[in-house]
Design a protein with these regions (language model features):
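RNA-binding accessory domains that recognize and position tRNA/RNA substrates
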Residues: 1-165
């Protein structure tokens, strides 16, 4: 099962505290309508802090949602709960080792919530784990960028991103 992380248009967060929930609810309704119109019924949709997350096993979700007005970006990710930074590192190595073979790479991490580690800690340790499979690290001009997002106790390993319309 994949998780799709949807970032809303930059106009929505600028709305007042009374108007913003209305726009966000409309965006959620539009996304659900688009999914149902395409025959996608197996999904779970949640919204938290301006980020919409859809869990679904259907591969068409990203292509459908990116065409909904108000969607800025859609990212397809593998998601899992974790107990420690070691869980994040071992799964990242398993997922991304084939992506970096013979290429220079960089690891980019975004983090939200309270943790005993920083984004840089994750990036450094994942980079260290992937280094043996790659041609090296190049932070300014990498061949491959490994994107990871951590929100509370869930880690998202970004596989692909689409810009919205």
């Amino acid at each position: 099962m994949y998780c799709y992380i949807i970032k809303e248009s930059s106009e929505i967060p600028l709305k007042s505290h009374r108007t913003r929930p209305r726009f966000e609810k409309r965006l959620l309704n539009n996304i659900e309508y688009a999914l149902k119109k395409e025959g996608i019924v197996d999904y779970d949709i949640t919204m938290r802090e301006g980020v919409i997350t859809i869990k679904s096993s259907d591969d068409k979700v990203g292509d459908v949602v990116r065409n909904v007005f108000g969607v800025h970006k859609v990212c397809k990710a593998l998601c899992m709960e974790f107990n420690s930074i070691n869980d994040i590192i071992s799964k990242a190595e398993e997922i991304f080792k084939d992506h970096v073979i013979g290429k220079k790479f960089a690891v980019r991490v975004k983090r939200a919530g309270t943790h005993t580690f920083t984004s840089l800690d994750i990036a450094a340790k994942v980079g260290e784990a992937l280094l043996k499979y790659s041609a090296g690290v190049n932070l300014s001009n990498p061949d491959v960028i490994i994107n990871i997002e951590v929100r509370d106790n869930v880690v998202y390993y970004i596989l692909k991103c689409w810009d919205g319309v």
